[in-house]
Amino acid sequence: MVMTHFSRLRQLLLLQPKFLSSQPRPLRSPPPTFLRSVMGSSSSFSSSSSKLLFRQLFENESSTFTYLLADVSHPDKPALLIDPVDKTVDRDLKLIDELGLKLIYAMNTHVHADHVTGTGLLKTKLPGVKSVISKASGSKADLFLEPGDKVSIGDIYLEVRATPGHTAGCVTYVTGEGADQPQPRMAFTGDAVLIRGCGRTDFQEGSSDQLYESVHSQIFTLPKDTLIYPAHDYKGFEVSTVGEEMQHNPRLTKDKETFKTIMSNLNLSYPKMIDVAVPANMVCGLQDVPSQAN
Protein backbone atom coordinates (compact mmCIF):
# COMPACT_ATOMS: atom_id res chain seq x y z
CA MET A 1 0.00 0.00 0.00
CA VAL A 2 2.89 2.37 0.80
CA MET A 3 4.50 1.68 -2.56
CA THR A 4 1.22 2.34 -4.36
CA HIS A 5 0.76 5.67 -2.59
CA PHE A 6 4.36 6.69 -3.29
CA SER A 7 4.06 5.78 -6.96
CA ARG A 8 0.87 7.82 -7.27
CA LEU A 9 2.49 10.82 -5.54
CA ARG A 10 5.52 10.60 -7.82
CA GLN A 11 3.26 10.46 -10.86
CA LEU A 12 1.41 13.60 -9.76
CA LEU A 13 4.65 15.47 -9.12
CA LEU A 14 5.94 14.62 -12.56
CA LEU A 15 2.81 16.10 -14.06
CA GLN A 16 3.25 19.47 -12.33
CA PRO A 17 4.35 22.38 -14.57
CA LYS A 18 7.94 23.53 -14.16
CA PHE A 19 8.87 27.23 -14.16
CA LEU A 20 12.31 28.59 -15.00
CA SER A 21 11.72 31.81 -13.08
CA SER A 22 9.73 32.84 -10.04
CA GLN A 23 8.93 36.12 -11.82
CA PRO A 24 6.77 35.25 -14.85
CA ARG A 25 6.99 37.71 -17.72
CA PRO A 26 3.88 38.82 -19.61
CA LEU A 27 4.25 36.80 -22.80
CA ARG A 28 2.02 36.19 -25.78
CA SER A 29 0.52 32.72 -26.19
CA PRO A 30 2.05 30.22 -26.71
CA PRO A 31 4.56 31.30 -24.05
CA PRO A 32 8.23 31.42 -25.08
CA THR A 33 10.75 29.44 -23.04
CA PHE A 34 14.23 30.50 -22.01
CA LEU A 35 16.76 27.68 -22.17
CA ARG A 36 20.26 27.82 -20.75
CA SER A 37 23.06 25.71 -22.15
CA VAL A 38 24.74 23.30 -19.74
CA MET A 39 28.08 24.75 -20.87
CA GLY A 40 26.87 28.29 -20.26
CA SER A 41 27.86 29.39 -23.75
CA SER A 42 24.49 29.91 -25.37
CA SER A 43 20.85 30.57 -24.64
CA SER A 44 17.75 30.56 -26.76
CA PHE A 45 14.48 32.43 -26.68
CA SER A 46 11.82 31.06 -28.95
CA SER A 47 8.42 29.44 -29.11
CA SER A 48 7.03 26.59 -31.14
CA SER A 49 5.21 28.99 -33.44
CA SER A 50 7.78 31.79 -33.50
CA LYS A 51 9.76 32.66 -36.59
CA LEU A 52 12.63 33.99 -34.47
CA LEU A 53 15.61 31.82 -33.67
CA PHE A 54 17.77 33.45 -30.99
CA ARG A 55 21.05 32.52 -29.35
CA GLN A 56 23.04 34.35 -26.71
CA LEU A 57 26.74 33.46 -26.93
CA PHE A 58 29.55 34.37 -24.52
CA GLU A 59 33.26 35.10 -24.90
CA ASN A 60 34.99 34.55 -21.58
CA GLU A 61 38.13 36.67 -21.85
CA SER A 62 36.34 39.97 -22.46
CA SER A 63 33.00 38.87 -20.95
CA THR A 64 31.31 39.80 -24.22
CA PHE A 65 27.91 38.61 -25.38
CA THR A 66 27.36 37.93 -29.07
CA TYR A 67 23.78 37.58 -30.28
CA LEU A 68 22.53 35.46 -33.17
CA LEU A 69 19.08 36.16 -34.61
CA ALA A 70 17.43 34.48 -37.60
CA ASP A 71 14.04 34.27 -39.28
CA VAL A 72 13.58 30.50 -39.55
CA SER A 73 10.18 30.89 -41.23
CA HIS A 74 11.89 32.32 -44.32
CA PRO A 75 13.11 29.80 -46.93
CA ASP A 76 16.69 31.15 -46.73
CA LYS A 77 16.73 31.38 -42.90
CA PRO A 78 18.53 34.76 -43.00
CA ALA A 79 20.53 35.62 -39.88
CA LEU A 80 22.58 38.37 -38.26
CA LEU A 81 25.17 38.57 -35.51
CA ILE A 82 25.40 41.43 -33.03
CA ASP A 83 28.80 42.22 -31.47
CA PRO A 84 30.81 39.21 -32.72
CA VAL A 85 34.30 38.67 -31.25
CA ASP A 86 37.30 37.69 -33.37
CA LYS A 87 38.28 34.86 -31.01
CA THR A 88 34.91 33.11 -31.31
CA VAL A 89 34.20 33.52 -35.03
CA ASP A 90 34.80 29.83 -35.76
CA ARG A 91 32.41 28.83 -32.98
CA ASP A 92 29.74 31.17 -34.31
CA LEU A 93 30.12 30.00 -37.90
CA LYS A 94 29.94 26.36 -36.84
CA LEU A 95 26.67 27.05 -35.02
CA ILE A 96 25.27 28.95 -37.99
CA ASP A 97 26.15 26.05 -40.28
CA GLU A 98 24.63 23.47 -37.92
CA LEU A 99 21.39 25.44 -37.76
CA GLY A 100 21.22 25.81 -41.55
CA LEU A 101 21.23 29.61 -41.45
CA LYS A 102 22.47 32.17 -43.96
CA LEU A 103 24.45 34.95 -42.30
CA ILE A 104 23.61 38.32 -43.87
CA TYR A 105 24.87 40.95 -41.40
CA ALA A 106 27.64 41.21 -38.80
CA MET A 107 26.71 44.20 -36.65
CA ASN A 108 28.31 46.18 -33.85
CA THR A 109 26.61 48.34 -31.25
CA HIS A 110 29.74 50.55 -31.07
CA VAL A 111 33.51 50.60 -31.49
CA HIS A 112 34.59 48.29 -28.69
CA ALA A 113 37.68 48.92 -26.57
CA ASP A 114 37.92 45.57 -24.78
CA HIS A 115 38.04 43.13 -27.71
CA VAL A 116 38.59 43.02 -31.44
CA THR A 117 35.36 42.69 -33.39
CA GLY A 118 34.80 39.55 -35.43
CA THR A 119 33.17 41.38 -38.33
CA GLY A 120 36.28 41.60 -40.49
CA LEU A 121 37.17 37.95 -39.97
CA LEU A 122 33.60 36.94 -40.74
CA LYS A 123 33.80 38.85 -44.01
CA THR A 124 36.94 36.98 -45.05
CA LYS A 125 35.37 33.61 -44.28
CA LEU A 126 31.95 34.50 -45.73
CA PRO A 127 32.53 37.21 -48.37
CA GLY A 128 28.82 37.92 -48.80
CA VAL A 129 28.40 39.07 -45.19
CA LYS A 130 27.91 42.82 -44.71
CA SER A 131 29.52 44.63 -41.78
CA VAL A 132 27.21 47.14 -40.08
CA ILE A 133 27.78 49.93 -37.55
CA SER A 134 26.46 53.41 -36.81
CA LYS A 135 27.54 56.26 -39.05
CA ALA A 136 28.39 58.26 -35.93
CA SER A 137 31.04 55.71 -34.95
CA GLY A 138 33.41 56.96 -37.65
CA SER A 139 34.63 53.43 -38.35
CA LYS A 140 34.69 51.46 -41.58
CA ALA A 141 31.85 49.12 -42.56
CA ASP A 142 29.73 48.11 -45.51
CA LEU A 143 26.56 49.70 -44.16
CA PHE A 144 26.19 52.72 -41.89
CA LEU A 145 23.15 53.20 -39.70
CA GLU A 146 21.38 56.29 -38.45
CA PRO A 147 18.62 56.67 -35.84
CA GLY A 148 15.32 55.32 -37.11
CA ASP A 149 16.86 52.96 -39.64
CA LYS A 150 15.64 49.37 -39.76
CA VAL A 151 17.70 46.25 -40.38
CA SER A 152 15.64 43.34 -41.70
CA ILE A 153 16.22 39.60 -41.89
CA GLY A 154 13.22 38.02 -43.55
CA ASP A 155 10.14 39.40 -41.83
CA ILE A 156 11.97 40.30 -38.61
CA TYR A 157 13.49 43.74 -38.21
CA LEU A 158 15.63 45.68 -35.75
CA GLU A 159 15.04 49.37 -35.14
CA VAL A 160 18.12 51.56 -34.62
CA ARG A 161 18.14 53.92 -31.63
CA ALA A 162 21.02 56.31 -30.98
CA THR A 163 22.30 55.82 -27.42
CA PRO A 164 25.62 57.72 -27.24
CA GLY A 165 27.42 58.32 -23.98
CA HIS A 166 29.64 55.28 -23.47
CA THR A 167 31.08 56.25 -26.87
CA ALA A 168 29.90 58.89 -29.30
CA GLY A 169 28.64 56.30 -31.79
CA CYS A 170 26.73 53.84 -29.60
CA VAL A 171 23.40 52.51 -30.81
CA THR A 172 20.81 50.14 -29.38
CA TYR A 173 19.07 47.63 -31.64
CA VAL A 174 15.43 46.97 -30.72
CA THR A 175 13.19 44.30 -32.23
CA GLY A 176 10.08 45.64 -33.91
CA GLU A 177 6.69 46.26 -32.40
CA GLY A 178 3.47 44.64 -33.50
CA ALA A 179 1.89 41.21 -33.51
CA ASP A 180 4.01 40.08 -36.45
CA GLN A 181 7.26 40.71 -34.54
CA PRO A 182 8.78 38.71 -31.64
CA GLN A 183 7.21 39.62 -28.32
CA PRO A 184 8.17 40.78 -25.79
CA ARG A 185 10.51 43.16 -27.55
CA MET A 186 14.26 42.78 -27.18
CA ALA A 187 16.80 45.59 -26.80
CA PHE A 188 20.47 44.95 -27.56
CA THR A 189 21.93 47.81 -25.58
CA GLY A 190 25.67 47.41 -26.10
CA ASP A 191 27.37 49.15 -23.16
CA ALA A 192 24.68 51.80 -22.72
CA VAL A 193 22.80 49.66 -20.21
CA LEU A 194 24.39 46.69 -18.49
CA ILE A 195 22.48 44.52 -16.06
CA ARG A 196 22.48 46.64 -12.89
CA GLY A 197 25.05 48.96 -14.38
CA CYS A 198 26.22 50.84 -17.47
CA GLY A 199 29.31 51.37 -19.57
CA ARG A 200 32.06 53.75 -18.51
CA THR A 201 32.17 57.25 -19.97
CA ASP A 202 35.80 58.31 -19.48
CA PHE A 203 37.18 57.56 -22.96
CA GLN A 204 36.21 57.43 -26.69
CA GLU A 205 34.33 60.74 -26.49
CA GLY A 206 32.20 59.40 -23.68
CA SER A 207 29.81 61.63 -21.75
CA SER A 208 27.92 60.73 -18.58
CA ASP A 209 25.43 63.52 -19.26
CA GLN A 210 24.77 62.16 -22.75
CA LEU A 211 24.56 58.54 -21.57
CA TYR A 212 21.96 59.42 -18.94
CA GLU A 213 19.82 61.23 -21.51
CA SER A 214 20.21 58.40 -24.03
CA VAL A 215 19.11 55.69 -21.64
CA HIS A 216 16.17 57.60 -20.23
CA SER A 217 14.87 58.79 -23.60
CA GLN A 218 15.64 55.80 -25.85
CA ILE A 219 15.65 52.69 -23.63
CA PHE A 220 13.60 53.42 -20.52
CA THR A 221 10.74 54.60 -22.75
CA LEU A 222 10.34 51.08 -24.16
CA PRO A 223 7.66 48.76 -22.70
CA LYS A 224 8.68 47.58 -19.26
CA ASP A 225 8.68 43.93 -20.31
CA THR A 226 11.24 44.63 -23.06
CA LEU A 227 14.14 42.24 -22.58
CA ILE A 228 17.54 43.88 -22.16
CA TYR A 229 20.52 42.06 -23.64
CA PRO A 230 23.80 43.92 -22.97
CA ALA A 231 27.17 43.58 -24.69
CA HIS A 232 28.86 42.45 -21.47
CA ASP A 233 28.25 40.97 -18.07
CA TYR A 234 30.74 40.44 -15.26
CA LYS A 235 28.47 39.02 -12.55
CA GLY A 236 26.84 35.97 -14.13
CA PHE A 237 23.66 37.64 -15.40
CA GLU A 238 22.25 37.01 -18.87
CA VAL A 239 19.13 39.12 -19.33
CA SER A 240 17.11 41.82 -17.63
CA THR A 241 14.08 43.93 -18.50
CA VAL A 242 13.49 47.64 -18.89
CA GLY A 243 11.24 47.54 -15.84
CA GLU A 244 13.88 45.83 -13.71
CA GLU A 245 16.59 48.32 -14.63
CA MET A 246 14.28 51.29 -14.08
CA GLN A 247 13.70 50.00 -10.57
CA HIS A 248 16.98 48.37 -9.56
CA ASN A 249 19.87 49.79 -11.60
CA PRO A 250 22.10 51.38 -8.92
CA ARG A 251 23.34 54.13 -11.25
CA LEU A 252 20.59 54.87 -13.73
CA THR A 253 17.81 55.12 -11.13
CA LYS A 254 19.49 58.19 -9.66
CA ASP A 255 18.92 61.77 -10.80
CA LYS A 256 21.27 63.04 -13.49
CA GLU A 257 23.63 64.99 -11.24
CA THR A 258 24.04 62.06 -8.85
CA PHE A 259 24.65 59.77 -11.82
CA LYS A 260 27.34 62.10 -13.17
CA THR A 261 29.03 62.17 -9.76
CA ILE A 262 29.00 58.37 -9.58
CA MET A 263 30.52 58.07 -13.04
CA SER A 264 33.24 60.65 -12.39
CA ASN A 265 34.34 58.80 -9.24
CA LEU A 266 34.61 55.26 -10.62
CA ASN A 267 38.42 55.47 -10.92
CA LEU A 268 38.56 52.60 -13.39
CA SER A 269 41.83 51.19 -14.70
CA TYR A 270 43.01 51.80 -18.26
CA PRO A 271 41.43 49.14 -20.54
CA LYS A 272 44.14 46.58 -21.27
CA MET A 273 42.98 45.97 -24.86
CA ILE A 274 42.12 49.52 -25.88
CA ASP A 275 45.35 50.29 -27.76
CA VAL A 276 44.87 47.19 -29.91
CA ALA A 277 41.08 46.94 -30.06
CA VAL A 278 40.09 50.49 -30.99
CA PRO A 279 42.45 50.90 -33.99
CA ALA A 280 41.47 47.44 -35.24
CA ASN A 281 37.78 48.04 -34.74
CA MET A 282 37.93 51.33 -36.60
CA VAL A 283 38.76 49.26 -39.70
CA CYS A 284 36.24 46.47 -39.07
CA GLY A 285 38.66 44.38 -36.99
CA LEU A 286 41.29 43.83 -39.69
CA GLN A 287 44.22 46.21 -39.32
CA ASP A 288 46.38 44.25 -41.73
CA VAL A 289 43.74 43.89 -44.47
CA PRO A 290 41.91 47.25 -44.58
CA SER A 291 40.56 46.52 -48.07
CA GLN A 292 38.35 43.82 -46.55
CA ALA A 293 36.57 46.37 -44.36
CA ASN A 294 35.38 49.06 -46.70
Swiss-Prot record:
Keywords, in A-Z order:
Acetylation, Dioxygenase, Iron, Metal-binding, Mitochondrion, Oxidoreductase, Transit peptide
What note does UniProt attach to the cofactor annotation?
Binds 1 Fe(2+) ion per subunit.
Q: Where is the transit peptide?
A: 1-39
* Name assigned to this protein: Persulfide dioxygenase ETHE1 homolog, mitochondrial
Similarity annotation: Belongs to the metallo-beta-lactamase superfamily. Glyoxalase II family.
CDD domains reported in the protein's UniProt record: POD-like_MBL-fold (cd07724)
Transmembrane intervals: none
